[in-house]
């Protein structure tokens, strides 16, 4: 049986070879093909042999038909292979688009939570101002009432002295005359006076309002996020489209600049940290490049190889916002913040802004924009070339965010870190000047 199978499957050989001979009638050539048995046979087999009555055809014609089937199979396999390759490409592209979309959604959330914190801070200030105003008005009423009582005491003391003098009069006639003159007033003074009981001023309505507000938020946040999103009709509508995973996260307008201006600062630059080939304006707000270095001793904090400069004052707590004008800075600029421990000597990564753990920055060079920290970089794709950057620092929250002010406060990048030292505004120049505008 194995021999027959081998013979049946063996390719056709030239005349005289074993593969051309009928396995049943070995003296005859196997010039036909039995379709039912799948074997090459001779002309006698379908008439007198074991393949009698079976459908047969010429072996050469069957070989042509099989070759066409093989070609069709190969073409089908190639098509399916291309389809699977296309599927892989589509999946990889969808994965990359999902990563970009996830990053933009997280940036959007960072922006929204920053706005929320700013709004809550503003609400806290308003609530405290309400308490202060109510307290001052009530204290003013208390003071006026106390002054009235004091004046009445003075009147009573004066009247007591007069009555006591009448009682000491030795002449009965004069005593009675004096008594008659003061009898009416004495009767008035002898009537019981009213007692003043200040009504306590209650701030419970304010406290209860914000207590219920916090409890409502807390109760909402106790529900798992996926449940909250399913229950939200807006999220359900957003989720109706299945073309993009994570479609629940929507891009919204940029935050209002006024929210940040409440924390506005105008940091001046420190000439002692400035590279020798940089020049600082008299107000300390504009720095530009110079062909010549400065003469005289080199201060220890000065950058000796990189055209960098730090702010004069650092921020070790709270929220701060400043802006940087880079419209004339040319093809390259670096804007960020740094610890005072940033290395000042040499041009190694330990001294370059954004290339170490001591500094963070947004960089532009030759139409490309990047965010740098500790040697790690993220590509930025602003909608337009930023001419003025807004820098927002929330020290306790560990947020350092950059915005395109002229582009409607569109978000550029946010760094998250547990800050360990004061942060100083930091700049690095390539060719043109960089300025820090005065903010209201």
UniProtKB/Swiss-Prot annotation:
Plays a role in the innate immune defense against viruses. Facilitates the type I IFN response by interacting with MAVS at the outer mitochondria membrane and thereby recruiting NF-kappa-B essential modulator IKBKG/NEMO to the MAVS signalosome, leading to the activation of both the IFN regulatory factor 3/IRF3 and NF-kappa-B pathways. Positively regulates the CGAS-induced type I interferon signaling pathway by stabilizing CGAS and inhibiting its autophagic degradation. Inhibits the transcriptional activity of SPI1 in a dose-dependent manner. Interacts with MAVS. Interacts with WRNIP1 and PPP6C; these interactions positively regulate the RIG-I signaling pathway. Interacts with CGAS; this interaction stabilizes CGAS and promotes type I interferon production. Interacts with USP14; this interaction mediates the cleavage of 'Lys-48'-linked ubiquitination of CGAS. Interacts with TBK1. Interacts with SPI1. Interacts with KDM4D and USP14. GO terms for molecular function: transcription coactivator activity; zinc ion binding. A zinc finger (B box-type) spans 17-59. It comes from Mus musculus (Mouse). It is found in: Mitochondrion outer membrane; Cytoplasmic vesicle, Phagosome. Disruption phenotype: Knockout mice have an impaired herpes simplex virus type 1 (HSV-1)-triggered antiviral responses and become highly susceptible to lethal HSV-1 infection. n addition, TRIM14-deficient mice are more resistant to inflammation compared to WT. Ubiquitinated. Undergoes 'Lys-63'-linked polyubiquitination; this modification allows IKBKG/NEMO recruitment to MAVS. Undergoes 'Lys-48'-linked polyubiquitination by RNF125; this modification mediates its degradation via the ubiquitin-proteasome pathway. Belongs to the TRIM/RBCC family. PANTHER family: B-BOX DOMAIN CONTAINING, TRIPARTITE MOTIF CONTAINING 14. This is Tripartite motif-containing protein 14. Gene3D superfamilies: 2.60.120.920, Classic Zinc Finger (3.30.160.60). InterPro entries: B30.2/SPRY, B30.2/SPRY_sf, Butyrophylin_SPRY, ConA-like_dom_sf, E3_ubiq-ligase_TRIM/RNF, PRY, SPRY_dom, SPRY_PRY_TRIM14. It holds the Pfam family zf-B_box. SUPFAM superfamilies: B-box zinc-binding domain, Concanavalin A-like lectins/glucanases. Keywords: Cytoplasmic vesicle, Immunity, Innate immunity, Membrane, Metal-binding, Mitochondrion, Mitochondrion outer membrane, Ubl conjugation, Zinc, Zinc-finger. Residues 247-440 form the B30.2/SPRY domain. Expressed with high level in spleen, thymus, liver and testis. Expressed with low level in the brain, kidney, and skeletal muscle. Expressed in various differentiation stages of B-lymphocytes. One of its GO terms (cellular component) is mitochondrial outer membrane. The lineage of its organism: Eukaryota, Metazoa, Chordata, Craniata, Vertebrata.
